[in-house]
């Protein structure tokens, strides 16, 4: 801690406690008598800047009173502040690092999911192709079975009593059909042949026969 004194006449506050001391805006300490001499010029007697001062007492603002406080106290506060802010920066960096790790993990999982999706899509395509082939195979064999059942059903109808009866009826009817019966022209030809035969037989026996 320093001793408060006038920076112009070097008067100490402890020596003349009744004399007021002032702190200028340019950070100089000036006693009341020296300040009175400079107030007419309105300039700091040490640096010549515009004079603007505040009296040093217990009613000073905190921002001004801190210039007269023990610097060790501020050093301790500074250490605490520095440690607090350093811890906060470390915590922020740790959070950022963990977020980065989580991001990398999510990226790997996403790549794995994308690969799995591609494999599943390929599997779906293969299964659809396999299903189409199976449907074609099933349709082919169902059609073959239907054709086989039709042939088998047709073969069984030939051996039923109704089919045999109908078959025999058709045969007997065809035997007696007009095509098998002698026609009129055939009968005429037969009669003519018979008459000529008779003539020939009678002509040979009755030659010279007279009534």
Swiss-Prot record:
Miscellaneous comment:
Nenya, narya and vilya contain a RING-type zinc finger domain and are named after the Three Rings of Power given by the elves of Eregion in J.R.R. Tolkien's books.
Q: Which GO terms describe its cellular component?
A: chromosome; site of double-strand break; synaptonemal complex
Keyword terms, alphabetized? Chromosome, Chromosome partition, Meiosis, Metal-binding, Zinc, Zinc-finger
Q: List every stretch annotated Disordered.
A: 149-211
* Cellular compartment(s): Chromosome
Q: Which gene encodes it?
A: narya
Where along the chain is composition biased (Basic and acidic residues)?
Answer: 153-165
Source taxon at top rank: Eukaryota
For bias type Low complexity, the affected ranges are 172-184
For this protein's source organism, the top of the classification is:
Eukaryota, Metazoa, Ecdysozoa, Arthropoda, Hexapoda
Q: Where are the zinc fingers (RING-type)?
A: 6-47
Describe the protein's quaternary organization and the partners it interacts with. Answer: May interact with itself, with nenya and vilya through its RING-type zinc finger.
Name used for this protein in its record: RING finger protein narya
Say what the protein does: Required for the formation of DNA double-strand breaks (DSBs) together with nenya and vilya during the meiotic recombination process. Plays a role in DSBs processing into crossovers. Plays a redundant role with nenya in chromosome segregation during female meiosis.
**Tissue specificity of this protein:** Expressed in nurse cell and pro-oocytes (at protein level).
Gene Ontology BP terms = homologous chromosome pairing at meiosis; positive regulation of meiotic DNA double-strand break formation; reciprocal meiotic recombination
Q: Which SUPFAM superfamilies match?
A: RING/U-box (SSF57850)
MF annotations from Gene Ontology: SUMO transferase activity; zinc ion binding
Query: Which Gene3D superfamilies does the protein's record reference?
Result: Zinc/RING finger domain, C3HC4 (zinc finger)
């Amino acid at each position: 801690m320093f001793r408060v004194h006038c920076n112009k006449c070097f008067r100490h506050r402890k020596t003349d406690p009744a004399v007021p001391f002032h702190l200028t805006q340019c950070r100089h300490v000036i006693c009341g008598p020296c300040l009175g001499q400079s107030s007419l010029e309105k300039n700091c007697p040490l640096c010549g800047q515009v004079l603007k001062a505040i009296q040093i007492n217990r009613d000073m603002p905190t921002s001004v009173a801190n210039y007269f406080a023990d610097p060790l106290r501020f050093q301790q506060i500074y250490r605490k502040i520095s440690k607090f802010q350093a811890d906060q920066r470390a915590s922020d960096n740790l959070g950022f690092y963990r977020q980065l790790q989580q991001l990398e993990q999510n990226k790997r999982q996403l790549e794995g999911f994308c690969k799995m999706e591609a494999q599943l899509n390929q599997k779906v395509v293969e299964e659809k192709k396999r299903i189409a082939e199976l449907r074609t195979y099933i349709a082919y064999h169902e059609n073959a079975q239907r054709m086989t059942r039709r042939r088998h059903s047709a073969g069984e109808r030939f051996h039923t009593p109704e089919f045999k009866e109908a078959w025999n009826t058709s045969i007997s009817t065809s035997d007696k059909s007009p095509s098998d019966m002698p026609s009129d022209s055939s009968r005429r030809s037969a009669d003519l042949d018979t008459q000529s035969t008779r003539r020939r037989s009678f002509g040979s026996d009755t030659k010279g026969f007279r009534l």
